[in-house]
Amino acid sequence: MKQQFFPQRLFMDMKRLIINRLVGLGLLVVGALVSCNAPTAFVPVPSPNPWVDDYTALSSMENYKQWGTYNVHDPACKKIGDTYYMYSTDAIFAENRKEAEEKNVPLGFIQVRKSKDLVHWDFVGWAFPEIPAPAIEWVHSQAEGKGATNIWAPFLMPYQGIYRLYYCVSAFGRNTSYIGMAESDSPEGPWIQKGCVVKTGEGDAMNAIDPSVIEDPETGKWWMHYGSYFGGLYCVELNPETGMTMQPEDHGHLIARRANYRKDNLEAPEIMYQPELGKYYLFTSYDPLMTTYNVRVAYSDSPEGPFVDFYGEDIKDTTNNVPILTAPYRFENHPGWAGTAHCGLID
């Protein structure tokens, strides 16, 4: 199987590189032992960490213009000209909407930032002034009037001078969800709502959240990947001219799932094409959002799959696929970071 060969070859190339480095290191060590009469004890030199991993002083919602990359959730980043634009979920734990209203701070919409160097970020504002009414109506109609309090997981896709901003609205913990799309002639807006791309309810296998769109460079076809632990991740073809599904009410086909969807989380597909290898890499997020959230990757010869992991296993099966690329971490003298997933790919 052709797809099984690539990771093994990559592993062997890395193995040879490590062996060569170790041989070189061994020669250096031998030379050092010959030239020294007695070993010198290593004494570490303490040095302060130049990176301050604490933004407590800026964490209040009224300081949003100073946040930089802090409080960025579910990011999507596109380079347009010489500027990087980043769109993200606006989420605050234990959010206080009364406080937000008193301080005149929008809450629950799509945050927009821009940068020239990926280091210094300017806060542009919020993409929409409100949650689109059709999304609220759909979610409320399927969830007994609950949900639809935030806009999640935006994704930007340029097309012939037009910018399409995909987003989703849902009821947390349910698959009553709505993926919508808005257009603008500027990456900073203003945006015109174009309607629903995919929507799901209690009777559907999938969950219409976390959209990610890619164009096949050979065929020009557009594919949207989306979904979550409700039924897994799906891929559906879009019409490049409209940005909507090629076939009305098409939900696409399954590309990834896990055994126990109530316990084993899976969501947030992000996909990229690597032209030198001719492969599509699908980055996904596994496990619970608040704790062991982690990023994993699979690959395919086609944007619509099938996608396989390092060992060539199709990620539609119920295997606990690897490798894990990022996971929660904690350094010494620091409380640590949890929920380090739903990655964004820099284009």
Residues of each region from the PLM?
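Bacterial N-terminal signal peptides that target proteins for export
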Residues: F6-V23
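Bacterial N-terminal signal peptides
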Residues: V23-V34
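Carbohydrate-active catalytic/glycan-binding domains of CAZyme proteins
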Residues: C36-D347
